[in-house]
């Protein structure tokens, strides 16, 4: 878990000299998890890391390695689950190299969540198939897909 500094910091501007942050795994929470684009002051964020280490949030740019955001799921099949307030997109049907699979891991669930949808291995990606777990405090649930 990390929190913001006194001004917003774009995720791609986070200094990560040891390359410890798993790409694509910085999440904010607002009733359901979302991929954060910026770290806002006073808010908490969950991230997945390969190892212990240090990162730096700064309102000024650093000339060191920053967090790389790469989408390895471009062109994959999608399943969007929505309750009209929150939505999540799950991906399947495309091979992602082993070293990039952790980029699609999700933070742990907790009982007070308003909405969450994920494959049961806590991922938003499955190569071919997977069982889906849903938390939904709303009576509606809409599924949309692209294949």
Residue spans of the language-model regions?
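N-terminal exported-region signature
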Residues: 1-147
């Amino acid at each position: 878990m990390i929190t913001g500094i006194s001004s917003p910091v774009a995720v791609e501007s986070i200094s990560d000299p040891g390359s410890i942050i798993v790409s694509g795994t910085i999440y904010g929470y607002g009733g359901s998890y979302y991929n954060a684009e910026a770290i806002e002051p006073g808010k908490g964020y969950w991230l997945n890391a390969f190892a212990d280490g240090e990162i730096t949030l700064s309102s000024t740019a650093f000339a060191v390695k920053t967090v790389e955001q790469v989408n390895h799921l471009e062109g994959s099949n999608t399943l969007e689950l929505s309750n009209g307030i929150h939505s999540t997109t799950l991906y399947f049907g495309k091979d992602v190299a082993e070293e990039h699979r952790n980029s699609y891991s999700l933070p742990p669930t907790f009982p007070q969540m308003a909405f969450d949808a994920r494959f049961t291995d806590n991922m938003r990606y499955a190569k071919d198939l997977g069982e889906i777990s849903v938390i939904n405090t709303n009576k509606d649930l809409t599924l949309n897909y692209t294949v």
